[in-house]
Amino acid sequence: MLEINIHQQLGSLNLTVNLHIAAKGVTAILGRSGAGKSSLINLIAGLTTAQRGYIKLGEQTLYDHEQGINLAPEKRHIGYVFQEHRLFPHYSVAKNLKYGCKRVDNAHFLQIVKLLGIEHLLNRYPSSLSGGEKQRVAIGRALLTKPQILLMDEPLSALDLPRKQELITYLSQLANQVDIPILYVTHSLDEIIRLADQLILLEQGKIIAFDLVVNVWHSDILADWQSETQKISLLELPLNIQQPIYKMVGLKLGKQHIWIPATPHYKIGDKLRITIASKDVSISLDQVQHSSIRNILNGVITQIVEHNDRVDIAVLIETHQIWASISLWSFDELALKIGQQIYVQIKSVSL
């Protein structure tokens, strides 16, 4: 577990953080520029020093103002991945990976290299690598030091979209397989959805939210970060049924299911996180009997939000909320009201 209780004055920013982070999983840190995100992980890494408070990682005290403890960065057993890859241009990939390791554990080396898909890059030099490949090497180098925690400061921010998609797949696999906590600074809600278990929302140096991603997502506190043109529903559901003939799998939603294309990465019992755009959800008063849409679910209207060009409808299905966006015309014609039983038709689901 990571325990942080610190205070630091950074110009006009008063950074005050008090939290406990679990010993495993990805905790995303979200906030606007200047909110204190990078400052917080730099304090944890020992690159800067708080004016008071303490930082503990497991049984080890990294910093304690009252006790006069302030371990040097290299003694904190922390892996740090920066926005820039910071590889040595005159070293091969293999040498870059091993840099900083007192003794190289060959089995661990091969495990990390395979996990990040960089076996074929070992004899190459940074100048011949893509941005995504460079960041994978930088992540590998951090992991090979066998850190007790991994800090990542916007590792995808310098990459173009194809490279981001490439690297986020590796990061997702990494998050599931490494047995250490990961602190992940980002501006991207998409990265949070794909990678994070918990979310810290920082605003002007203060924590205004810290909870499971799904819980923060559905709270009003994240509204300013989301699209003004539609709502995005975020659900985390167990995979509990397969339809092998049509290569589909069903995610359990109470007594109902959401069907998605089968993927080899998941098995029965695994929890999958999905998003549903409100523009991809329509509403009917009766269950449609013959439709090409597979996901038709029964629910109750719990909230109605009218806009100039549309109406957003929140529908409670079992214990999960899904948003639909419909036209003003449709809203008037259907005469929808809170508490009404209706059916939603979901045209598209994203993993």
Swiss-Prot record:
The keyword NAD does not apply. One of its GO terms (cellular component) is plasma membrane. Keywords: ATP-binding, Cell inner membrane, Cell membrane, Membrane, Molybdenum, Nucleotide-binding, Translocase, Transport. Residues 290-351 form the Mop domain. Its EC number is 7.3.2.5. The lineage of its organism: Bacteria, Pseudomonadati, Pseudomonadota, Gammaproteobacteria, Pasteurellales. ATP binds at residues 31-38. PANTHER family: ABC TRANSPORTER I FAMILY MEMBER 10 (PTHR43514:SF4). This is Molybdenum import ATP-binding protein ModC. It comes from the Bacteria. The complex is composed of two ATP-binding proteins (ModC), two transmembrane proteins (ModB) and a solute-binding protein (ModA). One of its GO terms (molecular function) is ATP hydrolysis activity. InterPro entries: AAA+_ATPase (IPR003593), ABC_transporter-like_ATP-bd (IPR003439), ABC_transporter-like_CS (IPR017871), Mo/tungstate-bd_C_term_dom (IPR008995), ModC_ABC_ATP-bd (IPR011868), Molybdenum_import_ModC (IPR050334), Mop_domain (IPR004606), P-loop_NTPase (IPR027417). Part of the ABC transporter complex ModABC involved in molybdenum import. Responsible for energy coupling to the transport system. It is a peripheral membrane protein. Its main location: membrane. It is found in: Cell inner membrane.
